[in-house]
């Protein structure tokens, strides 16, 4: 049996020494990096690694000793959020479904910041597993202040009529019911000034023909955010949503057509895809006291991918 390729070691982000901004690949440069990977793709297997360097980011202890549970934190945006929270002083529970190697790399990066980290291998489609994840977070890390709903499933299909029923159910069960189950499990333990942050998507506002089912769930997440914000506002618990544009993560080579991968990010004003370490600071804003008067907000981090709902 072939040995599992170890995850490439991501350089540990510096808390206090921002450097020059890295060069980000443009959409025109993506063709040379394009590859197709099987789903679920491991970040460790990507030729062009998503940027997690946080080279221009300066931490300021904005989440000191807070406890965060981040779903889908083994790779991509979720990993970047976990690392950014750790840089700001939080302890992090990393919830993931399948990719142990990637999850262990996230744990290494969190612990490199001097923070505690636990791994929770769970399926957010199962309400009982969501409750168990919250119980373990509270028991092993000492509480829960921040829930980040980020786990997601997508699979592109050229023809809407051909989307299999199994795919549609998995997409909705993961992307919207999973968020609901996690919120239901977490809310009884959240206090004033704690928060929930959901990951939406610009395609939940604009639509996209090859991801119809996924777009529907992201639109539902935006509505869930606003509804929960009104429900939890009287208790001082904030609920917000980060709305990314195209971001370079393992989902792209695993779920998108090759012709889309080869020009990924072409449709935005900045003419390139975002990198995970460019998205994570929005989550820090919403989790920290800097966002204390923000609730029910859809925070666009899209590189200029516009929608009529901005």
PLM ranges: what are they?
Residues 3, 28-31, 126, 131, ...:
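Conserved mid-core segment of classical short-chain dehydrogenase/reductases
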Residues 33, 51-55, 157, 206, ...:
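Short C-terminal tail/terminal secondary-structure segment
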Residues 145, 161-180, 197, 221, ...:
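Catalytic Tyr-X3-Lys loop
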Residues 183, 217, 225:
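Active-site helix of classical SDR
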Residues 188-189, 230-234, 292:
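Alpha-helical segment proximal to the catalytic Tyr-Lys
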Residues 201:
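Residue(s) in the substrate-gating loop at a strand-loop-helix junction
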Residues 243-254:
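Short, flexible catalytic-loop segment of classical short-chain dehydrogenase/reductase
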Residues 268-279:
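A conserved structural motif in NAD(P)-dependent oxidoreductases
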């Amino acid at each position: 049996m072939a040995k599992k390729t170890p995850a490439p070691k991501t350089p540990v982000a510096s808390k206090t020494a921002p450097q020059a901004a890295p060069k980000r690949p443009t959409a025109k440069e993506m063709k040379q990096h394009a590859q197709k990977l099987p789903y679920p793709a491991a970040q460790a297997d990507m030729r062009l690694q998503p940027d997690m360097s946080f080279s221009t980011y300066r931490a300021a202890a904005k989440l000191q000793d807070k406890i965060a549970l981040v779903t889908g934190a083994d790779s991509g945006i979720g990993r970047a959020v976990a690392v950014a929270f750790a840089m700001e002083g939080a302890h992090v529970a990393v919830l993931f479904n399948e990719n142990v190697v990637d999850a262990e790399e996230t744990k290494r990066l969190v612990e490199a910041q001097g923070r505690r980290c636990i791994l929770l291998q769970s399926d957010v489609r199962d309400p009982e597993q969501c409750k168990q994840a919250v119980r373990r977070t509270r028991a092993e890390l000492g509480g829960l202040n921040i829930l980040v709903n980020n786990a997601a499933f997508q699979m592109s299909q050229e023809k809407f009529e051909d989307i299999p029923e199994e795919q549609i159910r998995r997409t909705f069960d993961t992307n919207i019911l999973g968020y609901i189950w996690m919120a239901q499990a977490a809310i009884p333990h959240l206090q004033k000034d704690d928060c929930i942050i959901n990951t939406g998507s610009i395609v939940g506002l604009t639509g996209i023909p090859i991801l119809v089912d996924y777009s529907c769930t992201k639109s539902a997440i935006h509505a869930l955010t606003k509804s929960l914000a009104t429900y939890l506002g009287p208790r001082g618990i904030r609920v917000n949503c980060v709305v990314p544009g195209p971001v370079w993560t393992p989902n792209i080579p695993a779920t998108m057509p090759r012709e889309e991968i080869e020009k990924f990010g072409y449709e935005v004003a900045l003419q390139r895809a975002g990198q995970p370490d460019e998205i994570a600071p929005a989550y820090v804003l919403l989790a920290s006291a800097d966002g204390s008067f923000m609730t029910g907000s859809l925070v666009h981090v899209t590189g200029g991918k516009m929608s009529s709902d901005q």
